[in-house]
């Protein structure tokens, strides 16, 4: 069945290991409550009616995913990823070749709010480029001296934003920009950076700062707090 303009597919790169978590288990498979971080992240996407399919990109030797209920979900597709995030995203894009618009969401970002997701998806009505969820920088930012634990100078924060996910783009545009950036050896830290490299300027859609990525051990407790609070608010 051909995708409609309103239908959105999501790609969730989940092939990473996350060594900064200091655990043997990949961070996306750590549990918060009765679900893994990956399950929380994916369910937040599937909760929106426009998201019709989620492609989860795992490492070829991953045996954990098959044990999750997600493995049998009718809206889930699983594909093998590559060595780098961009390679995994490309693999995910290949699996949704008919999609008009795609979301890319971190596997270890479980605290996405539905209001933020709805605002991001709404930009497809008027944009040909897409955009990302982002949070304005609130702290004073310092640039360090190369190779030293010393301050080089203070960075003006007026126009600085923390890039979050999901990031939301026309599927063909993202595919073409990633293809060119990878071919030309550009440094791609997120999907938006591939579009920037090709001269596009994705929109910044302000999102909640509690949409954190679980990267370090202390992030796990914080994510659990945020998720528990959200569940209680939804039940109130």
Swiss-Prot record:
InterPro entries: IspD (IPR001228), IspD/TarI (IPR034683), IspD/TarI_cytidylyltransf_bact (IPR050088), ISPD_synthase_CS (IPR018294), Nucleotide-diphossugar_trans (IPR029044)
Record keyword NADP present: no
Enzyme class: transferase
SUPFAM superfamilies per the UniProt record, alphabetical: Nucleotide-diphospho-sugar transferases
Reactions the enzyme catalyzes: 2-C-methyl-D-erythritol 4-phosphate + CTP + H(+) = 4-CDP-2-C-methyl-D-erythritol + diphosphate
Endpoints of the signal sequence: none
UniProt-annotated site: Transition state stabilizer, residues: 20, 27
GO molecular function: 2-C-methyl-D-erythritol 4-phosphate cytidylyltransferase activity
Highest rank taxon of the organism: Bacteria
Entry keyword set: Isoprene biosynthesis, Nucleotidyltransferase, Transferase
Listed PROSITE patterns: ISPD (PS01295)
Family: Belongs to the IspD/TarI cytidylyltransferase family. IspD subfamily.
Stored PANTHER family: 2-C-METHYL-D-ERYTHRITOL 4-PHOSPHATE CYTIDYLYLTRANSFERASE, CHLOROPLASTIC
Assembly information from the UniProt record: Homodimer.
Protein function: Catalyzes the formation of 4-diphosphocytidyl-2-C-methyl-D-erythritol from CTP and 2-C-methyl-D-erythritol 4-phosphate (MEP).
Protein name per Swiss-Prot or TrEMBL: 2-C-methyl-D-erythritol 4-phosphate cytidylyltransferase
Gene source species: Salmonella arizonae (strain ATCC BAA-731 / CDC346-86 / RSK2980)
Taxonomic lineage of the native organism: Bacteria, Pseudomonadati, Pseudomonadota, Gammaproteobacteria, Enterobacterales
């Amino acid at each position: 069945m051909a995708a409609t303009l309103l239908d959105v597919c999501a790609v969730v790169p989940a092939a990473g290991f996350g060594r900064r978590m200091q655990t043997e288990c990949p961070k996306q498979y750590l549990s918060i409550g009765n679900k893994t971080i990956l399950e929380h992240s994916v369910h937040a996407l599937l909760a929106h009616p426009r998201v019709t399919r989620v492609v989860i990109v795992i490492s070829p030797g991953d045996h954990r995913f098959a044990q999750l209920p997600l493995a049998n979900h009718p809206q889930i597709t699983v594909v093998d990823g590559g060595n780098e995030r961009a390679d995994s995203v490309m693999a995910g894009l290949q699996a949704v070749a008919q999609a008009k618009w795609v979301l890319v969401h971190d596997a270890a970002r479980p605290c996405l709010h539905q209001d933020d997701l709805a605002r991001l998806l709404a930009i497809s009505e008027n944009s040909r480029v897409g955009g990302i969820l982002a949070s304005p920088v609130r702290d004073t930012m310092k640039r360090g001296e190369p190779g030293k634990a010393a301050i080089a100078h203070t960075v003006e924060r007026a126009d600085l934003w923390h890039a979050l996910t999901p990031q939301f783009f026309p599927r063909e545009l993202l595919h073409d920009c990633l293809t060119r950036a990878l071919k030309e050896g550009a440094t791609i830290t997120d999907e938006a950076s591939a579009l920037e490299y090709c001269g596009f300027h994705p929109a910044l859609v302000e999102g909640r700062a509690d949409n954190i990525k679980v990267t370090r051990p202390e992030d796990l407790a914080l994510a659990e707090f945020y998720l528990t609070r959200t569940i209680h608010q939804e039940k109130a």
